[in-house]
Design a protein with these regions (language model features):
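Glycine/threonine-rich flexible loop motifs
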Residues: 311-321
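ATP-dependent carboxylate activation and anion-phosphoryl transfer catalytic cores
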Residues: 1-221, 226-232, 236-240, 264-268, ...
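Short N-terminal or domain-adjacent regulatory/targeting segments
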Residues: 274-299
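Amphipathic alpha-helical
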Residues: 82, 248-281
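Extended, domain-scale alpha-helical bundle/helix-rich regions
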Residues: 235-239, 245-252
Length: 362
C-alpha cells in the first residue's frame, strides 16, 4: 500500500465490503484485487472465504488475529461487541502501523534440472519470508537476509556484477527469481529509474529506493580497507545494511564493524506490533530507527530458533517441532521465545510463545 493512493484504497475497501456482504460470509475472507494505474481499472482476482496463506500473512503483517476474531464471530458476537484497544471496538478498527512489512518469495529452481527460471501467473515459489522494519529500505534488506540463500545484501549476487548494463537490461525483459538482484546491479552500471520501470513496470518509488541503496553502497565501498566515518555507518545501519555485508564491502573483519558500532552506542532496538482485540499481546521486530520498547523480565527463558522459509527438504515438520517445544517448555515453567521469519507457520502465531521476534535467523 506504499504507492496506492488513499482514494484507491477506499475504493478497494468498499468493494471488498460489498463482496463479503453479497456472499454472506461470517468470519475471515480475503479478496484480492488487481489495479491498473494507467486506466484506474480494478479487477477482482480471487475470493477466499476461509483462512488461507494470504490471510495468515495479512494477520501477521497487521497484528490482527483473523482466526481468533473468526471464532468469536462464529460464536455469535458482532464486531461492535469485540473490544479492540485504542479503537474501542472492532467495528472501528483500521490498520495504521508505523512500520513496513515485506513478503519475499523463496524459489528453488536450482533444485530442478531443466526448470526454466521464469515467473508468471503460476505459483513456483516453495516458501516465503516476512520482514518488518521502520522503513522500506530496512525491511527490504532484512527480507534478503531472511531467505537464507547465503546473501546478506542485494549486491554481488551470482555473476551479475560482471555483466554490462546492456546484458543486465536484457535479463530484465522476462521476470525471474533474480530480478531484484539484477535491477540492483543494473542501477550500479548506470541504468536509469525510467529504463527499469519500462522493462519491469515496477513503480518508480521502489526503484528509486533501490537506487538510493546502490548509491549508499558505492559510498561505503569507497572507504575500502579503512574505517567508516561514524555518520556513514549510522545511516547504513538505519537503511538495513548488515554488519557482515558492510565488512565485505570494506574488506575487513565483521567484528570490526560490530565493535565500531557498539563503541558508538548503536545497537538495534525492539519495537512491538500490538495484537488487536487482546489486552497486551505483542510480537517484536528489530530496528535502528526507533526506541527500545521491549520489557525485560527476570524469568528463566529459553529461545527456540525457527526453521525459516520453507524449502526443498525442509518444511512444516520443523515448525511442528518448534511449536511443541514451546508448549512443553511453558509447562515446565520457562518463558519461551521464538525467533522466526516465516509467516506460513504456527510458530509465528502471537500466542505460541511468550515472546515472538519476527527476524532473520542469520
Amino acid at each position: 500500500m506504499l504507492t496506492i493512493s488513499k482514494e484507491v484504497q477506499d475504493r478497494l475497501q468498499e468493494q471488498a465490503y460489498r463482496i463479503v456482504e453479497s456472499i454472506g460470509v461470517i468470519g475471515g475472507t480475503n479478496v484480492q484485487f488487481a489495479h491498473d494505474p494507467v486506466t484506474d481499472r480494478i479487477v477482482v482476482i480471487e475470493i477466499n472465504p476461509r483462512t488461507s496463506r494470504s490471510s495468515a500473512l495479512a494477520s501477521k503483517a497487521t497484528g490482527f488475529p483473523i482466526a481468533l476474531i473468526s471464532a468469536m464471530l462464529a460464536a455469535g458476537l458482532t464486531l461492535d461487541e469485540i473490544p479492540c484497544g485504542k479503537y474501542g471496538t472492532l467495528d472501528k478498527y483500521y490498520p495504521d502501523g508505523d512500520y513496513v512489512v515485506i513478503k519475499f518469495a523463496r524459489w528453488a529452481f536450482e533444485k530442478f534440472k531443466g526448470a526454466e527460471d521464469k515467473l508468471g501467473t503460476q505459483m513456483k515459489a516453495v516458501g516465503e519470508v516476512m520482514s518488518i522494519g521502520k522503513t522500506y529500505k530496512e525491511a527490504f534488506q532484512k527480507a534478503i537476509r531472511s531467505l537464507e540463500t547465503g546473501r546478506y545484501g542485494l549486491g554481488y549476487a551470482k555473476n551479475f556484477n560482471d555483466l554490462s548494463k546492456d546484458e543486465l537490461l536484457k535479463l530484465l525483459i522476462n521476470p525471474t527469481s533474480e530480478r531484484q538482484f539484477i535491477m540492483y546491479e543494473a542501477l550500479r552500471k548506470g541504468a536509469t529509474v525510467n529504463e527499469l520501470f519500462e522493462l519491469t513496470k515496477i513503480k518508480h518509488y521502489f526503484i528509486e529506493q533501490m537506487k538510493e541503496l546502490v548509491e549508499e553502497e558505492e559510498n561505503i565501498a569507497s572507504y575500502k580497507g579503512n574505517q567508516l566515518p561514524d555518520d556513514v555507518l549510522k545511516q547504513a545501519k538505519k537503511d538495513g545494511f548488515a554488519d557482515k555485508y558492510i565488512s565485505k564491502l570494506l574488506d575487513v573483519e565483521e567484528k570490526e564493524i560490530r565493535n565500531q558500532r557498539l563503541a558508538m552506542g548503536m545497537h538495534q532496538v525492539w519495537e512491538p506490533v500490538h495484537v488487536s482485540s487482546t489486552k497486551d499481546s505483542s510480537y517484536y521486530y528489530s530496528t535502528y530507527n526507533g526506541k527500545d520498547q521491549d520489557e525485560v523480565s527476570n524469568n528463566k527463558k529459553i529461545m527456540i530458533l525457527g526453521g525459516g522459509p520453507n524449502r526443498i527438504g525442509q518444511g512444516i515438520e520443523f515448525d511442528y517441532c518448534c511449536v511443541h517445544a514451546s508448549l512443553a517448555l511453558k509447562k515446565l515453567g520457562f518463558e519461551t521465545i521464538i525467533v522466526n521469519c516465516n509467516p506460513e507457520t504456527v510458530s509465528t502465531d502471537y500466542d505460541t510463545s511468550d515472546k515472538l521476534y519476527f527476524e532473520p535467523l542469520t
